[in-house]
């Protein structure tokens, strides 16, 4: 049997305050810090910073 994956599901939420979010995974061993990525927010219709929050 294969070992369980070391990836954790996370939620990237828009800092524009629109409530839009993306979900993705990340490896906690190689990236222990929180992610912050510029992505397109379709509600704000521009690129904004998305910050990582815990996926419930």
From Swiss-Prot:
PROSITE patterns: RIBOSOMAL_L33 (PS00582). This is Large ribosomal subunit protein bL33. The keyword Ribonucleoprotein applies. It comes from Delftia acidovorans (strain DSM 14801 / SPH-1). InterPro entries: Ribosomal_bL33, Ribosomal_bL33_CS, Ribosomal_bL33_sf, Ribosomal_zn-bd. One of its GO terms (cellular component) is cytosolic large ribosomal subunit. One of its GO terms (biological process) is translation. GO terms for molecular function: structural constituent of ribosome.
């Amino acid at each position: 049997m294969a070992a369980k994956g070391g990836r954790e599901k996370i939620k990237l939420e828009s800092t524009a305050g629109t409530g839009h979010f993306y979900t993705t995974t990340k490896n906690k061993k190689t990236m222990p810090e929180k992610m912050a990525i510029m992505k397109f927010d379709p509600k704000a219709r521009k690129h904004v910073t998305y910050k990582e929050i815990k996926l419930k």
